[in-house]
């Protein structure tokens, strides 16, 4: 992968793709931003609109619409294309339709000669990331999904409201499926460096009503609470994509909970799931293996088993 340029393509200029593009432009994350959509005129319109906001930023990003052929020189291709779940559906229910879209998208991108990093947000993101890895033939470190990055952010926000602490002082991760079966590694959640389990034990009078299982469920259902009120979510996931892309270009070595293809980590093989990973200019440098408790291991394995069952429906 080239190291001297900062070029991004976004495939899918719906609400998630356009929100991601807006974050990327405002933060000056890349030099060039290519927008691709099945509705080319929509991509053209988004590119025009974003170009017109450049003068109000401290950046100078070239934004334009194009096609898969233009992906050849891109460093990162972000895929947000895919159907939104309907009321009553889970993210997993969109798998069949999303998988068909990926076959066309990945084929077109790879035919251009693309040799960079795929960054996925299309749901169900863990399975779609695995599919894109298989279809592309790229090394597993260069196919990354947003995974539980947004869930981990939601977790920290929920805890911050309960504990009255800045969420940036809370560290911890949701693991497993970006969906209903995700779990939280509570044994590794800290507040100001202090284990949350210790805090809850020592301060029962203040925090005795906090129910950890309820927080896990609230975290997993947060997207649906937004969905019920405004129809879909896009700001959080758009910023998550921009954050990961920035970490790649800046070679930050930042630890982010992403969809990563596992090959022995956590005792799991041939599956893509949400885990903390070190993100660098080459993609995933290393999966961070947390020392989980027996109960956490069981919950994590159960989440992965659910993903495997759905993977079989598209031939994996």
Swiss-Prot record:
SUPFAM superfamilies from the UniProt entry: LDH C-terminal domain-like, NAD(P)-binding Rossmann-fold domains
One term under GO cellular component: cytoplasm
Binding-site residues for beta-D-fructose 1,6-bisphosphate, renumbered to this chain: 156, 171
Top-level EC class as recorded in UniProt: oxidoreductase
Binding residue positions for NAD(+): 16, 37, 42, 68, 104, 121-123, 146
Alphabetized UniProt keyword annotations: Allosteric enzyme, Cytoplasm, NAD, Oxidoreductase
Reaction catalyzed: (S)-lactate + NAD(+) = pyruvate + NADH + H(+)
Taxon lineage: Bacteria, Bacillati, Bacillota, Bacilli, Bacillales
Database matches in InterPro entries: L-lactate/malate_DH (IPR001557), L-lactate_DH (IPR011304), L-lactate_DH_AS (IPR018177), Lactate/malate_DH_C (IPR022383), Lactate/malate_DH_N (IPR001236), Lactate_DH/Glyco_Ohase_4_C (IPR015955), NAD(P)-bd_dom_sf (IPR036291)
Subcellular location: Cytoplasm
Family affiliation: Belongs to the LDH/MDH superfamily. LDH family.
Record protein name field: L-lactate dehydrogenase 3
Documented EC number(s): 1.1.1.27
Pathway in which this enzyme or protein is active: Fermentation; pyruvate fermentation to lactate; (S)-lactate from pyruvate: step 1/1
Active site per the UniProt annotation: 178
UniProt cross-references to CDD domains, sorted A to Z: HicDH_like
Highest rank taxon of the organism: Bacteria
Protein residues bound to substrate: 91, 123-126, 151-154, 233
Regulation of this protein's activity per its record: Allosterically activated by fructose 1,6-bisphosphate (FBP).
GO molecular function: L-lactate dehydrogenase activity
PANTHER family linked to this entry: L-2-HYDROXYCARBOXYLATE DEHYDROGENASE (NAD(P)(+)) (PTHR43128), L-LACTATE DEHYDROGENASE (PTHR43128:SF16)
Function as written in the Swiss-Prot or TrEMBL entry: Catalyzes the conversion of lactate to pyruvate.
Subunit description: Homotetramer.
Family matches, as Pfam families: Ldh_1_C, Ldh_1_N
NCBIfam families for the chain: L-LDH-NAD, PRK00066.1, PRK06223.1
UniProt KW Cytoplasm keyword: yes
